[in-house]
From Swiss-Prot:
Essential protein required during embryogenesis. Believed to act as a component of the putative class C core vacuole/endosome tethering (CORVET) endosomal tethering complexes. CORVET is required for vacuolar transport of SYP22. Involved in root development. Plays a role in vesicle-mediated protein trafficking of the endocytic membrane transport pathway. Its main location: membrane. Residues 21-339 form the CNH domain. The keyword Cytoplasm applies. The keyword Cytoplasm applies. It is a peripheral membrane protein. Pfam families: Vps39_1, zf-Vps39_C. Keywords: Cytoplasm, Endosome, Membrane, Protein transport, Transport. InterPro entries: CNH_dom, Quinoprotein_ADH-like_sf, Vam6/VPS39/TRAP1, VPS39/TGF_beta_rcpt-assoc_1, VPS39/TGFA1_Znf. It comes from Arabidopsis thaliana (Mouse-ear cress). This is Vacuolar sorting protein 3. One of its GO terms (biological process) is root morphogenesis. CHCR repeats lie at residues 663-844.
Amino acid sequence: MSKSRAVVELTARFDLGGDDKIRALSLSPISDSQTLVYLGTYSGSLILLSLDTLTNTVSRLASVSLSPSPVESIFVLGEERGRVLALCNGYLFLLDSLLSQPAKRLGGLLKGINVIAKRVRGRDSSSTDLLPSEISTDSSSSKKFLQLLGAGNLVSDVRGNDSRHERVQQGHYVFAVAIGERMLLIELQCAEKEGLSGSFVVLKEILGIGGIKTLVWLDDYVIAGTVKGYSLISCVTGLSGVIFTLPDVSGPPLLKLLCKEWKVLLLVDNVGVVVDTNGQPIGGSLVFRRRPDSVGELSFYLVTVGDGKMEIHQKKSGACVQSVSFGPQGCGPSLLAADEAGDGNLLVVTTLSKLIFYRRVPYEEQIKDLLRKKRYRETISLVEELDSQGEISKDMLSFLHAQIGYLLLFDLRFEEAVNQFLKSEKMEPSEVFPFIMRDPNRWSLVVPRNRYWGLHPPPAPFEDVVDNGLMAIQRANFLRKAGMDTPVDEEFFSDPPSRADLLDSAIKNITRYLEISREKGLTLPVREGIDTLLMLLYRALNRVEDMENLASSGNNCVVEELETLLTESGHLRTLAFLYATKGMGAKALAIWRLFTKNYSSGLWQDSDDLVPYLHDNELIRLSGKEAAAAEAARILEEPCDPELALQHLSWIADVNPLFAIQVLTSDKRTEELSPEQVIQAIDPKKVEIIQRYFQWLIEERDYTDPQLHTSYALSLARSALECVEVQNGIQEADVPNGSEAHDSNVGSISLFEVDVRERLQAFLQSSDLYDPEEILELVEGSELWLEKAILYRRIGKETLVLQILALKLEDCAAAEQYCVEIGRPDAFMQLLDMYLDPQNGKEPMFKAAVRLLHNHGESLDPLQVLDKLSPDMPLKLASDTILRMLRARVHHHRQGQIVHNISRALDVDSRLARLEERSRHMQINDESLCDSCYARLGTKLFAMYPDDTIVCYKCYRRLGESKSVTGRDFKRDVLIKPGWLVNR
């Protein structure tokens, strides 16, 4: 046996003895441990052998002589107590399976047969059912006589059955036989109860095809091989076509049905072409080393024999995986038969009078052999092939991937090892823990003790694995120099890797495995081990960003295992994130505070570095101090101890007031902070933080504490006063200095988008809970005129409000609107007096006075207006306005008179209409009926409604005085009749 993979192994040999040679061969398994072997010889004998697969012994059971001519073909029909059909000397012979009875020859039309093939139907075939026409009771006596003689019933056509169910009953088999220039499709009927009696029915006769050497019948098509080439024949229509022709110098045709794929292999010398049922080539050609005498199918392999050698090829690629010599070169033609009906593990090869039995090596042993030889690629290919053919279970497939992965890992091929681990569905991620952390450790008990094949050492830390692997490479290199063959990969000899590179590759790939394993549904201890060890691996690779992402997200890291290591290595940010996710906020805040204090002492690389920070799902870059404060604020935004928030609020506000506001105004907090304690915790100089906090309490939390509202208003007022002082100082200074003062505040952080005075004015107008007098006391002597106007209005000092609006702010529209809100005419007169006599040496505001008279002159008394007008007022300014005011006054007076008179007329009209309604007369006679009950009124009392309906007194009491028989309710739906005023 040559050096190759052991797919099959020799199990037994048998020699017929004498000069008789084997011409035909067929196998029939009858149990798991016994297989019958039928041999056809050149002398015309049929010999039965038995192979015991448990003891690998071969025994001769029986033999039958059929004819002096060679036995060409043997078919085993049925399973238990079946039949054997043999082709010898152009005739078909029917025998029992044990050859215990004499053979019966089928005569009639079946003589001179060259080749015979049994019909095979695919698993999902929709081929036509071949059903012979039943012999009816009125059939001619000649047809019945021919059938009784065994001549067969000739059927001229093939009928299809709608149910697509072929009539293959017990003892009914369909064959194609080639006789001279014609081919017959027959059904052989072998009734079990009738012993060897059998008959056949001719289903179809196809003419015009001669010289057939080999046949395969699959579904609706027969593929025939002749010396000229291969043809495709339809068993339905009888039409034939050429698949391809053979070269002039070529060996005889050879066909092999591939039962696994339901395809057919066509041989052209040493080239095999696979075609489907329609004769269409599928895939590429298979090139063998020599032209085979016979071809067999063993699982997903093709087996060829010839010239004393047996070769096993992969079906897909045609690559030879094993070559076995079973006889001398030039020993003559060989035959091959495989157990295609049983478990598919038995293979028999014949040469002359000898039989050699082979059994397929179990795939576990094949894989073990390949793994021992470190032929990993072939192993993986074999495993994938077994999986695609469905010959291994999912559990076994998972086991094999894990086993291959372990061997690759100990061979320092870490990437390929992890790829195999990932393909293993049953492998536990905890199995790789011993490669990362030495035993004993926290997770030693969760590592499963899976039983592998013992082809690799027990798991050990990667340092030991790499060291042992490098030593093995050195030993292999020494042995190779000594002339010995070693299984070490050539890559390690040509380009030996360094220890550091191997460790880096090991850590990177096992990190990849753990990252993917996190997505699996695992127990809590295993999840803790994965995340904790993953953090250690990130630390070893110095992947700081991955460390921080893992620590800041949902994880199962064990803090006790990482706390000391992260502190020693200086990964304090990662440790702070880890503390925060584990609910240890106090420790995390201590680290963030330490960062802000020691920012320039080496905890950060460079004070100018910007740190990425995720804020509202948007990645921004902050300075190191700001990033630390932001992370601290993020912790304090969550539900936590209020004392903890107050403790760290001050330094967060020192770094960035925005983060302090996030802490104070967090909606996630379950326990509110005390406003008094918050004010004490914040530096009084950080006025905007306090104001923003007050604003949040009042607007978002709806606080109604008057003291809080007053404090907020006072704080805003103080800020407004400071702002006014700053603005006055800028205006008094020179322009360049003013610009410089303005630029110096550009970099400051503002918590508000609205000016402080606008916020103060809005709050003073919206809130009713503050103390206006206390605020007035603060702003009394300031220039905050509008604010003071709002406050004076709160306490009801209308005159002061008008003075501020009209004289200080000169806001005529606001002053007039305030007078409208007061709603008294004297307010407009008071405003007019202020415009005409402003006092304090101010000039009269004639335009404002004219505007007031123009807009609200109708509300003023003309005499009082004329009395108030100053003699100094230009007549041209006021003449038109006064004239329009007087006209409007007269118009309003006359309009009032008109309205008064119209009202009186309507009143008179309604009285007259009511009088007319009450004075109406209704004539009742003997024929008058009640509109409700239709009773004669006669001399009864009755009532009449405004819609002229009449009812008796009884119905009136029932309906009421406001609702008539028509359903109209006169209280809701008043009936209006035109009066004298409308008629006029």
